Swiss-Prot record:
Gene that encodes it: eif2a
CDD domains per the UniProt record, alphabetical: S1_IF2_alpha
Function in brief: eIF-2 functions in the early steps of protein synthesis by forming a ternary complex with GTP and initiator tRNA.
All residue ranges annotated as the S1 motif domain in the record: 22-93
Protein's name in the database: Translation initiation factor 2 subunit alpha
Keyword Ribosomal protein: no
UniProt cross-references to Gene3D superfamilies, sorted A to Z: EIF_2_alpha, Nucleic acid-binding proteins, Translation initiation factor 2, subunit 1, domain 2
HAMAP family tied to this protein: eIF_2_alpha (MF_00231)
Family indicated by similarity: Belongs to the eIF-2-alpha family.
Quaternary data: Heterotrimer composed of an alpha, a beta and a gamma chain.
Originating organism: Aeropyrum pernix (strain ATCC 700893 / DSM 11879 / JCM 9820 / NBRC 100138 / K1)
UniProt-recorded Gene Ontology molecular function terms: ribosome binding; RNA binding; translation initiation factor activity
UniProt-listed InterPro entries: NA-bd_OB-fold, S1_domain, S1_IF2_alpha, TIF2_asu_arc, TIF2_asu_C, TIF2_asu_middle_sf, TIF_2_asu
Keywords: Initiation factor, Protein biosynthesis, RNA-binding
Amino acid sequence: MSEEGGVEVKLLKPRKPLPDVGEIVVGTVQEVHDYGAYLILDEYGGVRAFLPWSEIASRAVRNIHAVLKPRQKVVVKVIRVYKKRGQVDVSLKRVMDSEKKRKMMFYKRYLKAATLVELIAEKLGKSVDEAYREVLWKLEDAYGDPMKGLEAAVLQGREALEKAGVPEEWIEPLLETAKTHVRVKTVKITFYLTLRSMAGDGVERVRKVLEAAKSQIESFKDSKVVARIYTVGAPKYRVELQGYNYKTLEKALEKMVEAARKTASKLGVEFSFERED
């Protein structure tokens, strides 16, 4: 945590001293003047950046104070880098809305991961530098985002951390913290099976078709895929697949439908499949 010009900011530790030209970064407004504003770059240890008045918006801004205020978080693009002075110039107007949204989401997730790992470091008697070097940067390299690494730890256990090269002494504390403080968003796919049999043991045949479909989920056990089957009203059955990514659910759906189709054909059960929009 740092306090610059009265603006308290939680600073992330940078892997390089200055950002590159064209890089999208997060900054905290420090001072606002008629000619522009000064920011602190949160991801670069408090590097100072200047946002010229002409780079605030595409249309003319009459009152800069109505657009920018001290302590405000902004997403900006680096347009000039002064290596000798350790400063940069940035632009607000050159960042698209989609870039702002994506960058702010990444930053917030990184900030949460850093906060959790730094708390663990304190308990282990480790420094902040060690927290970044031994955990955060390793998870970022392996998963593109340290929070994704912690989410993987929730789903896969210690293997996800070992894969990233995290030292053994960190693994159990990280697993414990991740399971308590990291929530992995679930996704769902719904589809319907229509199964008809006019045979005397038709109910039993339909049950076997449904069992054949559900048995396919066993191969997705490590991915934490859950399947639930509900009777909408014979002969229609609603199947809900829940997991942590759509790609895995799509594979599970394909296997379930194929198993149901083959079993239905073998048992003489009329079969049809329909996805929910």
